[in-house]
From Swiss-Prot:
<dbReference type="GO" id="GO:0001556">
    <property type="term" value="P:oocyte maturation"/>
</dbReference>
<keyword id="KW-0963">Cytoplasm</keyword>
<dbReference type="Pfam" id="PF13695">
    <property type="entry name" value="Zn_ribbon_3CxxC"/>
</dbReference>
<dbReference type="GO" id="GO:0017148">
    <property type="term" value="P:negative regulation of translation"/>
</dbReference>
<comment type="function">
    <text>mRNA-binding protein required for maternal mRNA storage, translation and degradation during oocyte maturation. Probably promotes formation of some phase-separated membraneless compartment that stores maternal mRNAs in oocytes: acts by undergoing liquid-liquid phase separation upon binding to maternal mRNAs. Binds to the 3'-UTR of maternal mRNAs, inhibiting their translation.</text>
</comment>
<feature type="zinc finger region" description="3CxxC-type">
    <location>
        <begin position="208"/>
        <end position="293"/>
    </location>
</feature>
<feature type="compositionally biased region" description="Basic and acidic residues">
    <location>
        <begin position="156"/>
        <end position="186"/>
    </location>
</feature>
<dbReference type="GO" id="GO:0008270">
    <property type="term" value="F:zinc ion binding"/>
</dbReference>
<protein>
    <recommendedName>
        <fullName>Zygote arrest protein 2.L</fullName>
    </recommendedName>
</protein>
<keyword id="KW-0221">Differentiation</keyword>
<keyword id="KW-0863">Zinc-finger</keyword>
<dbReference type="GO" id="GO:0006412">
    <property type="term" value="P:translation"/>
</dbReference>
<keyword id="KW-0217">Developmental protein</keyword>
<dbReference type="InterPro" id="IPR026775">
    <property type="entry name" value="Zar1"/>
</dbReference>
<feature type="region of interest" description="Disordered">
    <location>
        <begin position="138"/>
        <end position="200"/>
    </location>
</feature>
<dbReference type="GO" id="GO:0036464">
    <property type="term" value="C:cytoplasmic ribonucleoprotein granule"/>
</dbReference>
<dbReference type="InterPro" id="IPR027377">
    <property type="entry name" value="ZAR1/RTP1-5-like_Znf-3CxxC"/>
</dbReference>
Length: 307
């Protein structure tokens, strides 16, 4: 009985006598022994109470005192301790003995670059979605260094032009220029060498505006639908001859949506030069002659179908 009562506190190795010994009898002092996982590298786990003995012990303890319960059985695990130090190789102490985890050799360090040097990708062309695989980096200050004529001439001398480069130069020379680019291009003699960097190619975008057809030569005026104009202006982009007389150049016009007399959007003039519907300001009549006719200004017609 006494052995069962004191069994939970001395069944483990290193915590007292063996199972079933009388605790009142003086026992010889145990020598300080090294732990089992230090002395024996491959020691078997200690045999604990089996399920039958544990159930029997629990029943006896419940009769003596309901509050007395057997000590929880130690899990069948292996103790392990890890030394964590980022500067030293990690040392692991387990039941197999001391082990050392070697750190993998670090990769070769790349040379430190300046922090201001930002690298990014850039497209191959102005509106091209294809991105150049080479990384483009700006120097300090965000401006490209100016190349002297001597530095530009040296690589040209070293590398001979390939036949592909010659073909590209021929194709670029044969590309036709638009009228707007020819008008904006300065005369070769008047351009200064210092202004070459400041000159930039001007890009023009188109937008649709509601316009009309008016030929001054044959006095023909028709309503038209939307006209392609240069954005921010009333200049018609697609210029052509009059379809009736084939003399008037660029008959398509775009007017401001306002009265021609008072120059207001909401007109209150008693007498007007010609009928202007402010709700539809570009649908204009000439002296009312087109009313109730097949091609009247009240209907919308596109200039593409007017002959």
């Amino acid at each position: 009985m006494a052995g069962f009562m004191y069994a939970p506190y001395n069944v483990y190795q290193g915590y007292g006598g063996n199972f079933g010994q009388n605790p009142h009898v003086a026992q010889p002092l145990a020598k300080n022994k090294q732990a089992a996982w230090k002395s024996n590298k491959a020691s078997e786990p200690t045999d604990y109470l089996d399920n039958f003995q544990r159930a029997q012990l629990k029943a006896i303890l419940s009769q003596v005192n309901p509050n007395l319960t057997p000590r929880l059985r130690k899990a069948n695990t292996k103790e392990i301790g890890v030394q964590v130090n980022p500067r030293v190789d990690t040392g692991v102490q387990c039941s197999l003995g001391p082990r050392t985890l070697r750190r993998p050799p670090p990769p070769p360090c790349s040379p430190v670059k300046a922090a201001d040097c930002v690298r990014f990708t850039r497209p191959l062309a102005v509106y091209s979605p294809v991105v150049d695989r080479r990384l483009f980096s700006l120097p300090q200050g965000g401006r490209l260094p100016k190349k002297s004529p001597d530095s530009q001439s040296q690589p040209l001398k070293e590398r001979a032009p390939s036949p592909e480069d010659k073909e590209r130069e021929k194709v670029s020379e044969k590309e036709p220029d638009t009228k707007d680019e020819l008008e904006k291009r300065p005369v070769p003699g008047t351009e200064e060498p210092g202004n070459e960097e400041q000159t930039k190619s001007a890009f023009q975008f188109l937008e649709q505006k509601y316009g009309y057809f008016h030929c001054k030569d044959c006095k023909t005026r028709w309503e038209s639908a939307y006209v392609w104009c240069i954005s921010g202006s009333n200049k018609v982009y697609f210029k052509q001859l009059c379809r009736k007389c084939q003399k008037g150049y660029n008959p398509y016009r775009v007017e401001a949506i306002q009265c021609q007399v008072c120059a207001k959007t909401r007109c209150s003039c008693p007498q007007k030069q010609r009928h202007i519907d402010l709700k539809r300001p570009h649908r204009q009549e000439l002296c009312g002659r087109c009313k109730n006719k097949r091609l009247s200004c009240d209907n919308t017609y596109s200039y593409k179908y007017i002959v």
